[in-house]
Amino acid sequence: MSYASVSAAETGGPDTAYDDAKVKAAARAQFISFAIDDNQYGVDIMAVREIKEWSNVTPLPNQPEYVRGVLNLRGVTVPIVDLRRRFGEGLTETTPTHIVIIVRSGEQQVGLLADRVLDIVAFETEKIQPIPRTAQGAASDFLSGLVTFDDTMIALIDLPSLFVT
């Protein structure tokens, strides 16, 4: 006599609803949305370490023009990237209302200079749309996709591509 192994999911048993919930949870994404001028961008919330007010940075020689300098964050030297400049839109004229989003990209922490944080947005990953082929310009090189949230288009930043020179 042989016995076949059958999972609860195959039989429609009690674990089916739990498995469906796990799949749905895995297919959701959360992003911190923020603004640069009138444009909205998002960065994966799992990469965000903290958000802090703008403070002066120490400029370093021979850095890419979009690196504003470095700051000391609890003993860790963190380079600060001016996203406006990285996107080819000129230097950010910083004020005390600007913010720095500290993210981890690979093994390095990096600060992203932005105008303001807007919200935490959650959506199904299937709602992420590709960047249109007609999109030209520096900013589109650093985006992984677009998502519409509450009638607003949010451009999702691909962190690794920001740091490729």
Language model segments and positions:
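An acidic, low-aromatic, low-complexity terminal/linker signal
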Residues: M1-T165
